[in-house]
């Protein structure tokens, strides 16, 4: 805990700077930095993230006590620079209070504007500015925001709208008006009175009038918001540790709602949706910042180019656009020129795409925030590659700029062009976040989460989203909002999550109570299907067919760049030629796991497999296996051909035999009829296969050692397919993997069968195919005796699913009964079946690699469990010297990027 808890900034000076984000949060550090490089920023101060942790450890009263002196002095610092006084009716200073963690968490925590107003100060503000409407507009906004954030005024149930919005709608209805800026001073005064009455009625206390009491309430509310439900969920999604805490930034208010020469807006130095190098953003005249991001009013475009593009998307002609929806470039050309110059300066300074908030107060431009902007996966890759081409960053930085998991977004399906041509367009909104989404309509976040859990794909439809909707946005395939622009909460958060989003669709009328949405005359109910095109803003009736994405352009260039630096190769887990082909197009350099058992479940194959299981003698088993042989050979032929010239690691039969027989009465009757035996015979045989703990029973190499004819048949199928391919001019590279070895003698026995069978095939065919025999290290004993096992194994493949299961003693199938509790209580930080346990399982891997290579110097080692596509696990594999990781086809690019990052981070 540092002794200094508060850092001031203003007038070109600052006690902090950009590299202090851990202490000051991203917002506080960047406000300090902007001061230092000459960007106009209202003066203020930042309370450190350490105080947030102190707040939760020691409590509110203790924190207020230790902060009082520094906060009082810092308020005086703002008063001196602004030449006004906090709480003084004759010359009032108003403040904003905002959160700011070290990692950007847009909309997840709380903000209060116009703090310091009461019935006396508002009159002084009106007199000082000569603008009574502005003063009371600021006052009603403050009471509304403070009532929500600090005093907890929320809707009583989810179908109700915000209690303050209900009052606003009532006043507008009485006056026959639609827009906030049409309200008179008398209307605004009525709102303040009614807001205060509602607060007194719902929470039982009067609205606080003392400005310092208001300030402490706001500071504590921001700290408290670090632990609100949506912030916790967002941290979990983004991997942000709880102990980081949030800073609190207090600033002098500058006002975008002082009249027609004032405005507020949000802008990006590049397109956060597609990554294009185009300055873009939105603004509202005579408004405050929260109006833009909350989506309460659909704002106008900052640039002329952006405005014309918006008009084209919305079907607005040029004359109407110019008169009713002009760009800032047209209406405030001098301010626009300053804004454009500063956004360019900030991007050049930070060498990354910037997301900026600004206010224009009576013709003067102020910056309230800059941060590295949230972006889609597509934009992430394009921006990194463009900055590299422009010389702003080097190759290593470009690789490190990309988040491996966000590459997943580039691999999502896209709408099929033929299906789109047939689809019925209902309306068009703003293309807030690209992607293709189809699903059933839901209106509430909790319903979206529940429907998703039940296996439904959903589209969440809202008037506008708020941070409370995060859980629903996470569960939904896409989001549609009636209000809000390209910089609204829905748009920013959707882009950050890689979710398809269409915002500000004017033809959409949502009725929460009836759970209906009317779209240009078509009424749809909860559960009806809807499709969204986040790249064009089009909304379609029903479901629209999709097709797989392709690796092209900047993505392909990034992957090529990764290959330049990576040492760890990436294979795929694939059981069919189709999966193998997909993985190969994504850059896989072989198959790290081909599971033979997955091939047995088709009709004719499962029948032959069951015949083998029912057999009582070796002769009968061999007859059944002869029936299976051509099927297996055909399967291996397809995969080896698809991966021509690349290694294909084929695991011999692994699961216990009971998995191949039916356990229900109906299935057993059908099997008896098919096999021409009695139901009782089937029942007895199934019962005889039953084990108390089948995952530790007769499976893996134990099957092959108990029934060696199974291993012999599979070897014949693998090498028979390889020989056929070699005769046809191909270059098959089979690897035969013996699973679940715990003792070197188990492998010794299996290797002898494989080699003997191979020699017979090669002699009979007159052709030899080079192949390797290896083992899966998935039992702790195998890892600890790896030096012995390496005397027989030509390679190791770590089966981290079972190795994790046996090291922890956790059943992968049953962990759900206690995992949520373990994660909540911090007994476990992560699910060890998703993220490799480096302290335990990882040490077994490290030991096995070291011991194995003492026996066999050039021993090839890889992993093929689910961890092979998880970025932190991939980086661990690089550090312990593995040759490759293997993962599902669609995780291959993610693993390639993570492997390159591991190599770059080591340089």
Model regions: which residues?
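Conserved alpha/beta-domain cores
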Residues: 98-99, 551, 561-907
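Nucleotide/phosphate-binding sheet-loop regions of phosphoryl- and nucleotidyl-transfer enzymes
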Residues: 1-423, 431, 450, 456-459, ...
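S4-like RNA-binding module at protein N-termini
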Residues: 507-540, 545
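Long, charged amphipathic helices and adjacent flexible linkers at domain junctions
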Residues: 237, 399-451, 457-458, 526, ...
């Amino acid at each position: 805990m540092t002794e200094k808890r508060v850092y001031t900034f203003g007038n070109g000076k600052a006690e902090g700077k950009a590299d202090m984000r851990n202490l000051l949060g991203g917002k506080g550090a960047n406000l300090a930095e902007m001061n230092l490089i000459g960007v106009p920023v209202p003066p203020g101060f930042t309370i450190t993230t350490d105080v947030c942790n102190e707040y939760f450890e020691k409590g509110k009263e203790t924190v207020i006590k230790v902060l009082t002196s520094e906060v009082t002095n810092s308020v005086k610092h703002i008063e001196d620079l602004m030449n006004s006084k906090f709480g003084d009716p004759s010359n009032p200073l108003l403040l904003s209070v905002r959160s700011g963690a070290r990692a950007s968490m847009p909309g997840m925590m709380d903000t209060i504007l116009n703090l310091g107003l009461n019935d006396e100060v508002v009159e002084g503000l009106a007199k000082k500015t000569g603008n009574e409407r502005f003063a009371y507009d600021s006052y009603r906004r403050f009471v509304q925001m403070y009532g929500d954030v600090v005093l907890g005024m929320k809707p009583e149930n989810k179908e109700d709208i915000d209690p303050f919005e209900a009052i606003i709608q009532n006043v507008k209805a009485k006056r026959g008006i639609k827009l906030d800026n049409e309200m008179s001073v008398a209307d605004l005064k009525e709102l303040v009175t009614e807001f205060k009455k509602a607060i007194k009625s719902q929470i039982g206390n009067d609205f606080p009038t003392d400005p310092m009491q208001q300030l402490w309430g706001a500071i504590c509310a921001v700290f408290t918001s670090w632990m609100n439900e949506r912030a916790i969920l967002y941290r979990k999604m983004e991997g942000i540790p709880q102990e980081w805490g949030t800073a609190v930034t207090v600033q002098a208010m500058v006002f975008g709602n002082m009249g027609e020469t004032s405005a507020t807006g949000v802008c990006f130095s590049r397109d956060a949706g597609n990554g294009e190098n185009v300055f873009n953003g939105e603004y509202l005249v005579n408004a405050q910042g929260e109006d833009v991001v909350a989506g309460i009013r659909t704002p106008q475009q900052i640039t002329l180019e952006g405005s014309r593009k918006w008009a084209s998307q919305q079907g607005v002609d040029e004359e109407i656009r110019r008169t009713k929806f002009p760009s800032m470039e047209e209406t405030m050309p001098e301010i626009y020129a300053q804004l454009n110059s500063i956004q360019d300066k900030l991007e050049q300074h930070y060498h990354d795409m910037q997301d900026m908030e600004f206010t224009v107060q009576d013709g003067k431009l102020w910056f309230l925030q800059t941060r590295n902007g949230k972006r889609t996966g597509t934009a992430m890759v394009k921006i990194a590659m463009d900055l590299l081409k422009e010389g702003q960053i080097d190759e290593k930085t470009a690789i490190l700029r990309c988040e491996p998991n966000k590459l997943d977004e580039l691999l999502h399906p896209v709408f099929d062009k033929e299906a789109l041509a047939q689809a019925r367009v209902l309306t068009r909104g703003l293309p807030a976040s690209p992607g293709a989404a189809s699903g059933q309509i839901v209106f509430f976040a909790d319903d979206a989460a529940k429907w998703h859990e039940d296996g439904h794909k959903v589209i969440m439809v809202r008037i506008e989203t708020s941070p409370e909707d995060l859980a629903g946005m996470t569960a939904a395939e896409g989001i549609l909002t009636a209000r809000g622009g390209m910089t609204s909460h829905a748009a920013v958060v959707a882009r950050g999550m890689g979710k398809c989003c269409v915002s500000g669709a004017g033809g959409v009328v949502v009725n929460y109570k009836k759970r209906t949405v009317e779209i240009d005359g078509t009424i749809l109910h909860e559960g009806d299907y809807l499709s969204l095109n986040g790249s064009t803003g089009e909304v379609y009736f029903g479901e629209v067919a999709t097709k797989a994405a392709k690796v092209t352009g900047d993505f392909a260039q990034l992957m090529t760049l990764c290959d330049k630096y990576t040492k760890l190769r990436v294979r795929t887990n694939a059981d069919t030629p189709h999966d193998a082909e997909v993985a190969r197009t994504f850059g896989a350099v072989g198959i790290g796991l081909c599971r033979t058992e997955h091939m047995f479940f088709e009709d004719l194959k499962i029948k032959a497999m069951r015949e083998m299981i029912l057999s009582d003698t070796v002769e009968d088993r061999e007859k059944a296996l002869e029936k299976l042989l051509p099927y297996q050979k055909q399967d291996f032929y397809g995969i080896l051909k698809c991966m021509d010239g690349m290694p294909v690691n084929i695991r011999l039969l692994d699961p216990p035999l009971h998995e191949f027989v039916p356990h229900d009465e109906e299935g057993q009757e059908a099997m008896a009829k098919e096999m021409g035996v009695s139901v009782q015979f089937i029942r007895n045989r199934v019962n005889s296969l039953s084990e108390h703990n089948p995952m530790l029973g007769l499976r893996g190499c134990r099957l092959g050692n108990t029934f060696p004819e199974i291993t012999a048949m599979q070897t014949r199928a693998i090498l028979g397919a390889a020989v056929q391919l070699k005769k046809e001019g191909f270059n098959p590279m089979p690897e035969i993997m013996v699973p679940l070895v715990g003792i070197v003698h188990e492998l010794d026995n299996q290797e002898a069968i494989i080699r003997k069978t191979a020699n017979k095939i090669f002699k009979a065919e007159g052709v030899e195919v080079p192949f390797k025999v290896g083992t899966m290290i998935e039992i702790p004993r195998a890892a600890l005796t790896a030096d012995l096992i390496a005397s027989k194994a030509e390679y190791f493949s770590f089966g981290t699913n079972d190795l994790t299961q046996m090291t922890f003693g956790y059943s992968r199938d049953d962990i759900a009964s206690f995992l949520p509790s373990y994660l909540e209580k911090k007994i476990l930080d992560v699910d060890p079946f998703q993220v490799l346990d480096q302290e335990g399982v990882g040490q077994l891997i490290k030991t096995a690699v070291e011991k194995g290579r003492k026996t066999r110097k050039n021993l090839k080692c890889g992993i093929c469990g689910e961890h092979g596509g998880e970025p932190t696990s991939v980086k661990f594999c690089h550090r312990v010297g593995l040759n490759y990781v293997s993962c599902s086809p669609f995780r291959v690019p993610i693993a390639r990027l993570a492997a390159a990052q591991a190599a770059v981070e080591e340089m």
